[in-house]
A protein has these predicted regions:
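Rossmann-fold cofactor-recognition segment
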Residues: 44-57
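NAD(P)H-binding glycine-rich loop region in Rossmannoid oxidoreductase-like domains
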Residues: 54-92
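N-terminal Rossmann NAD(P)H-binding glycine-rich loop of SDR-like oxidoreductase domains
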Residues: 5-25
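Conserved glycine-rich Rossmann-like NAD(P)H-binding loop of the short-chain dehydrogenase/reductase
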Residues: 27-36
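Active-site helix of classical SDR
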Residues: 141, 145-148
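SDR active-site strand-loop-helix element
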Residues: 8, 32, 70-74, 113-119, ...
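NAD(P)-dependent short-chain dehydrogenase/reductase
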Residues: 127-128, 151-198
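Conserved Rossmann-fold NAD(P)-dependent oxidoreductase catalytic core, especially the SDR/UDP-sugar
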Residues: 72, 98-139
Length: 198
């Protein structure tokens, strides 16, 4: 019987690549997120099942599955959004993470959780190189919210014995990326008739 994985935020750049990877490893893949996906789009990114919904205990339980692995890619992915809409950013990032953790604690304590975090947690660091023990000083609401989510993951791991790995991903690029410096540069070059200077 195939192992089962739940990917929150599976339609996004990171989530869709995670889904494709685990599908290629033979997992039965389940995804949840805010946007709609057609059956064809789901299959293109390696999803067997897609649910358009908020990330909540209730919505995860509606899959009626016990997952071996959960990769929580859901939440806000924009520093700019967090500055313009800090409350909404908090709900997406922190509340969504808490829903996943509570689902695991109460309903699926044997699952392994992978939480992709961000270097925004570390913020600006005067000392180089940055060491793993550096507590960080986030420079944006996005960074603070990711830090709170990391702290929740660490707390649930220590207090309830949940198996959680936090991975801070730096400068992730690849097919399907539609934001960040590389994307912006390529679009400017593609759409410009003049010389592009950065």
């Amino acid at each position: 019987m195939s192992k089962k994985i739940l990917i929150t935020g599976a339609k996004g750049f990171l989530g869709s690549n995670v889904s494709t990877h685990f599908k290629n490893l033979g997992y039965e893949t389940y995804g949840i997120g805010h946007d709609g996906l057609s059956v064809e789009e789901s299959k293109e990114i390696g999803l067997d099942y897609w649910k358009k919904d908020d990330i909540s205990i209730k919505s995860i339980l509606e899959f009626e599955q016990i997952f071996d692995v959960i990769v929580h890619c859901g939440g806000s992915g924009s520093v700019g959004f967090s500055v313009e809409h800090p409350y909404d950013d908090f709900k997406k990032t922190v509340d969504g993470t808490l829903e996943v953790l509570e689902y695991m604690r109460v309903h699926n304590p044997n699952a392994k959780l992978i939480y992709p975090s961000s270097p925004a947690v570390q913020g600006e660091c005067e000392d180089a190189p940055i060491i793993e023990e550096y507590l960080g000083k986030p420079a944006s609401p996005y960074g603070y919210h990711k830090k709170i989510a990391e702290d929740l993951c660490q707390s649930y791991s220590e207090k309830f014995g949940l198996k959680i790995s936090i991975v801070r991903l730096f400068s992730v690029y690849g097919n399907g990326l539609k934001k960040q410096l590389l994307w912006d540069a390529c679009k400017k070059i593609q759409n410009s008739k003049d010389e592009v200077v950065f």
